[in-house]
Regions:
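Phosphate/nucleotide-binding beta-alpha loop and adjacent structural elements of enzyme active sites
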Residues: 1-261
Length: 261
């Protein structure tokens, strides 16, 4: 980020030091970062309107720190192409919109989430952005998709409509996606069922980054599946440090040599 922007944030950290030390979080300083800000990632500079993101619940700059500075989805990549992206677990569309900016004017980004957030202004704006498609879908594995009882067990606790159940393969078929340059996954534990079933759709994916919820399942299973389908795989814990595969918090995989050595 620009030096002046960094100094703004460091100044906010000093002003809110007592709160930051008490909460052990930088949120108090993050809330002072408003307006359009610039970030540098993978060789390019991006401008982001933090106030627009703050229309969602939560702290916009805190997430931008994770995305651009800690680079939670990109820290193990040396280069990535974003021409066609798939965002599984897109929520209100913040990551989807950032991926679209990274993809450029001709890029296409598809986001999937079980909720539509009808009152969220940021999501509404994202939906109207050329090159972005948001799909309401409850992601699941093929075995659950074909088992009505299992589908209700998965959906009912969250109030999800079983009619919106969809596999990754079906998402790709729905939108004619023959090739995905970058796949981001954050689906709150549902990733284990998706990778446990048939994963032929991975043949059409170059690079992927995912947040993996190791309290729900064993990340080593996903890592093995990725390796079996031809991916080079790396993983880190939630804080970004090397860890054994069972305790992975983030997984990064490439089929085209995009990971750092």
């Amino acid at each position: 980020m620009p030096k002046s922007q960094a100094l703004r944030w460091y100044g906010a950290v000093l002003r809110h030091a007592p709160t930051i030390l008490r909460e052990r979080k930088f949120y108090a300083a993050d809330r002072e970062m408003r307006g359009k800000l610039s970030f540098f990632l993978l060789g390019s500079t991006f401008s982001v309107d933090v106030d627009a993101i703050n229309s969602t619940s939560g702290n916009g700059y805190a997430f931008l720190r994770e995305f651009f500075i800690r680079q939670i989805y990109f820290r193990e990549f040396k280069h990535v192409n974003f021409d066609t992206c798939l965002d599984l677990g897109c929520n209100t569309g913040v990551v989807t919109s950032l991926l679209k900016q990274m993809a450029g004017p001709q890029g296409k980004v598809y986001g999937v989430d079980p909720l539509t957030y009808p009152d969220n202004t940021f999501r509404a704006k994202t939906c109207a952005t050329p090159g972005i498609t948001l799909h309401q879908g409850v992601l699941c594995g093929e075995s659950v998709r074909l088992d009505p009882a299992a589908l209700h067990v998965m959906c009912n606790p969250y109030g999800f409509d079983t009619n919106h159940a969809i596999t990754v393969k079906e998402v790709m078929e729905t939108y004619g996606l023959k090739h995905i340059d970058f796949l981001k996954i954050d689906i709150e534990g549902a990733e284990f069922a998706i990778f446990r079933d048939s994963a032929l759709w991975l043949d059409n994916v170059d690079n992927l980054a995912m947040e993996v919820h190791n309290s729900v399942g064993n990340p080593a299973e996903i890592i093995l599946r990725l390796e079996q389908t031809g991916f080079q795989v790396k993983w880190l814990d939630d804080a970004g440090y090397p860890v054994d595969s069972r305790h992975a918090g983030y997984i990064y995989a490439s089929k085209i040599g995009s990971l750092k050595e």
